[in-house]
Amino acid sequence: MKYFVIALALAVALVCIAESTAYEVNEELENELDDLDDAAWLAVAEELQGLEDFEESRGLFGKLIKKFGRKAISYAVKKARGKN
């Protein structure tokens, strides 16, 4: 009976350890997923900034589009930072 109690206590201890580390791993995975989402968003933003290099963006309205794009990006950055 004594060995059964010791084995049960060890099993409970192992389950407690496994449960406590599982949440940390899940939180780390969620943080990494958020980081990947941010990196993907930044990559798309960089691609959009590079549109002025394409031949399609050059033309009669190219300068207006660039000017509007820069103003829109700076406005979005100011709003994101809370500077109104």
UniProtKB/Swiss-Prot annotation:
Superkingdom to which the source organism belongs: Eukaryota
Subcellular localization, as worded in the UniProt entry: Secreted
Propeptide: 23-58
Keywords: Antibiotic, Antimicrobial, Cytolysis, Fungicide, Hemolysis, Secreted, Signal, Toxin
Keyword Signal appears in the UniProt entry: yes
Role played: Has antimicrobial activity against both Gram-positive and Gram-negative bacteria, and yeasts. Also has a strong hemolytic activity against rabbit erythrocytes. Causes paralysis, but is not lethal when injected into insect (M.domestica) larvae.
Family note: Belongs to the cationic peptide 03 (latarcin) family. 02 subfamily.
Protein name: M-zodatoxin-Lt2b
Originating species: Lachesana tarabaevi
Lineage: Eukaryota, Metazoa, Ecdysozoa, Arthropoda, Chelicerata
